[in-house]
Amino acid sequence: NLLITDNIAKYYSINIKYGELNWLNIGSYSFNSEIKKTDNKFFTIDYKNTLRSFDINDGTELWNFQTDDIFTMPDSKNSLIIVGNLVIFNNSIGDITAVDVETGQITWQLPTQSSNIINESYNFKTSKLVSDGKSIFFSNNKEEFYSIDIKTGVTNWINDINSILTPLVIGNIIFTVSEKGYLLSLIHI
């Protein structure tokens, strides 16, 4: 089955083999992230910075987790990853949040920007989140490249790199490209 969310608040499932609609539902707000799937659930984030968990069989909402909202519509998509029993995601003001896959209960949250970002969020952009299973890596257009511990949400380190491209993790080496076009490699110990 193909799972789809769109920018007019619809989410649906299509049978790939026959091209038939399995189910269609309409949410409260448009969606602003990719879809991630695990077992019988899928996850997405809407424009109100709410992570939503849906049943894959009929689209029923299982739970949701609201983070801080903003007054403007961001022009970049939010990112989410699933690592073990956690869904880890960013919102449009730079918070990184980890919640339990089954219950939606918060495990940790890390604000990466000052409260002033709410007024500047239309201009704030981040890369997609990536993980090596122990840490999360991402960067933003505020010259910050982060490594965050998955279990605790504690910042391992921050480097001065201005990039919104998705980092690539190969072993203990992280590759990214800066806004100025430089290929950078970081060794993560």
PLM segments and residue spans:
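Beta-propeller domains
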Residues: 138-146, 152-155, 163-166
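Structural signature of WD-repeat beta-propellers
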Residues: 6-7, 46-47, 84, 91-92, ...
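Extracytoplasmic beta-rich repeat domains
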Residues: 1, 20-39, 60-84, 105-133, ...
